[in-house]
From Swiss-Prot:
The gene is tmk. Pfam families: Thymidylate_kin. CDD domains: TMPK. Belongs to the thymidylate kinase family. This is Thymidylate kinase. The lineage of its organism: Bacteria, Bacillati, Bacillota, Bacilli, Bacillales. It comes from Bacillus licheniformis (strain ATCC 14580 / DSM 13 / JCM 2505 / CCUG 7422 / NBRC 12200 / NCIMB 9375 / NCTC 10341 / NRRL NRS-1264 / Gibson 46). It catalyses: dTMP + ATP = dTDP + ADP. GO terms for biological process: dTDP biosynthetic process; dTTP biosynthetic process; dUDP biosynthetic process.
């Protein structure tokens, strides 16, 4: 594929969604063809699945059901939106991808990273991100940001206890240990301006490495 696939990962409240859109805008201004998208979601079918997964009333959802729904949404999003964009040579910036499932369901939910990776391999095949930008923030700080953001409608994961979010952070640390080559870490506790500068630098380096 001729494009570049960059994913944005991190715990709740890390600010990656805001930075992703700003980075996409900068790339577009610089003359690049960009697709900014998200998981779960990005297309109609996957957005419907997102509504099921994140509905605050669905507290009885089994962890395996949750993992399978994420994988299903990921598959449809991949074949309908991500792969075509990469084949067209676009830069794809995606808010969450497989690493979220590994950290949230594999580690925090206790299903096992290897098991969840296997499920997702069936969904995505061999396609992995070229670069993954991890937004590092203390879980308590992330939750505080969510609580202070009146414009954000809290979803089922936002409402989890602090311990769950701490497990997610540990899960990401384990995932980064397994795939160290493609991860770039950003201190998300900094100002938006500093975080964006760091992210833009990472993306520029990736463009040079891939001769884009």
């Amino acid at each position: 594929m001729n494009g570049l696939f960059i994913t944005f990962e991190g715990p709740e409240g890390a600010g990656k969604t805001t930075i992703l859109q700003a980075a996409a805008d900068q790339l577009t201004k610089n003359g690049h063809s960009v697709l900014a998208t998200r998981e779960p979601g990005g297309i109609e079918i996957s957005e419907r699945i997102r509504e099921v997964i994140l509905n605050p009333s669905h507290t009885a959802m089994d962890p395996k059901t949750e993992a399978l729904l994420y994988a299903a949404a990921r598959r449809q999003h991949l074949v309908e939106k991500v792969k075509p964009a990469l084949e067209e040579g676009k830069i794809v910036l995606c808010d969450r991808f497989i690493d979220s499932s590994l950290a949230y369901q594999g580690y925090a939910r206790g299903l096992g990273i290897d098991e969840v990776f296997s499920v997702n391999q069936f969904a995505i095949g061999s396609l992995m991100p070229n670069v993954t930008i991890y937004f590092d923030i203390d879980p308590e700080e992330g939750i505080k940001r969510i609580d202070l953001n009146d414009a954000r409608e809290k979803n089922r994961l936002d409402l989890e206890k602090l311990h769950f979010h701490q497990l997610v952070q540990k899960g990401y640390e384990e995932v980064m240990n397994r795939f160290p080559g493609r991860f770039r870490i950003v201190d998300a506790s900094q100002s938006v301006e500093l975080v964006l500068k760091r992210v833009n630098n990472i993306i520029e380096e990736a463009l040079k490495e891939n001769q884009l």
